[in-house]
Amino acid sequence: MSSGVQPTQECLEKFQELKTGKKLTYVIYGLSEDKRSIVVLKASEDKDFDSFVAELPEKDCRWAVYDFEFTLPGGEGVRNKLCFIVWSPDDASVKNKMIFASSKEAIRRRLDGIHTEIQATDFSEITKDALFEKATRK
């Protein structure tokens, strides 16, 4: 069931900037204060994965796209995959979790070029190893 919430034009523009410009490393999305639209909360060039994870709140939901760069074993080179992350921490309110769950597809379907998706409820589920496993799965 859809909540009727839609992403702003800035959401789509920042995603395109991440996807094509390769300057941004991640974009974090959330709901506007009136909960009527999806907005960009942060877009960053910081390549430090731990800094990205630190931007996710302990008690509030978010969506994010992270440009995950990794090295394949056996000398196969460096790859990049766009990962869509659904952050719905256990400590978020039930109402917030419901709004985010019902609004996810509104943003996800507008972000063409996502390779993989991770849904996480705890920081232990958002690790480089988890992203690597998803990004290299065939």
From Swiss-Prot:
Where is this gene product found? Cytoplasm; Cytoplasm, Cytoskeleton; Nucleus matrix
CDD domains according to UniProt: ADF_cofilin_like (cd11286)
- Residues annotated as domain ADF-H: 2-136
* Gene name for this UniProt entry: COF1
Query: Got a GO cellular component term for this one?
Result: nuclear matrix
InterPro entries given in the database record: ADF-H (IPR002108), ADF-H/Gelsolin-like_dom_sf (IPR029006), ADF/Cofilin (IPR017904)
Instruction: Keywords in alphabetical order, please.
Output: Actin-binding, Cell cycle, Cell division, Cytoplasm, Cytoskeleton, Nucleus
Q: Pfam families under this entry?
A: Cofilin_ADF (PF00241)
Function noted in UniProt: Controls reversibly actin polymerization and depolymerization in a pH-sensitive manner. It has the ability to bind G- and F-actin in a 1:1 ratio of cofilin to actin. Binding to F-actin is regulated by tropomyosin. It is the major component of intranuclear and cytoplasmic actin rods. Required for accumulation of actin at the cell division site via depolymerizing actin at the cell ends. In association with myosin II has a role in the assembly of the contractile ring via severing actin filaments. Involved in the maintenance of the contractile ring once formed.
Stated family: Belongs to the actin-binding proteins ADF family.
Q: Which GO terms describe its molecular function?
A: actin filament binding
Q: What is this protein called?
A: Cofilin
One GO BP on record is:
actin filament severing
- Asked whether the keyword Cell cycle is assigned, the reply is yes
